[in-house]
Every structure is written in C-alpha cells, then in structure tokens.
Amino acid sequence: MSERAAVSSERITAIQQRLAEGLAKIDPHHRLLGRPLSYRVIDGRMLEITYRDVAGIAEAEVLGVKRILGRDCYCTVAPQTAESVTVRFVVPLE
C-alpha cells in the first residue's frame, strides 16, 4: 500500500469514527442514525458519505453534521421518493 493510500485510509477511518460519535450526540430524532449508509472514495481525494431513505432533514441538522466533518465539507439534499430524500456529504481527504 502506498504512503498516500495509507494516509487516506487512516483519514477515512478517523472521519467514520468522528461521524459515528458525533451523530450519537446531535441526532436525537434519528434522522440519519440507522439509515442506509454508503461511503465512496472519489479520485482518491474526496470521501462521499451518502444517507438514503431519510424522511427529512432540517438545515440546522445538516450544519451540525458539517461541524462534525469539518468546514471544507459540503452537502447536497435531493429527493429520493415522495416521502424521503438522499443526503450526501463530500469531505476532502487531503
């Protein structure tokens, strides 16, 4: 494994741990906790975190997650079905 890949792997693990611990504190209504979740590395430089089947999410909740992930993170919320949305966060790995 290259040094860059090892650093990225460590950073991804740190982001996943920080997100799990942070959501436990800021998501009392379980809007994101327990939802289908996927991670995808984009070009080895960014980590996309996607939550599916989210019943709805307030801007304040998105801002809370962004505080956990870091200020360089950005988010999109898109309709998935009439009753749910998909929430994506993208975090730089560098």
What are these model-derived regions, one by one?
Residues 29-38, 70-78:
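Short secondary-structure junctions
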Residues 1-13, 92-94:
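Short intrinsically disordered terminal tails
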Residues 42, 68, 80-82:
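A generic structural signal for short, non-catalytic loop/turn and secondary-structure boundary residues
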Residues 75-94:
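C-terminal edge-of-domain segments
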Residues 33-56, 86:
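Short glycine-rich, basic-tinged beta-strand/loop micro-motifs
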Residues 9-32, 58-69:
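Short amphipathic alpha-helix segments
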Residues 56-59, 93-94:
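Short, charged/polar, Gly/Pro-enriched secondary-structure boundary elements
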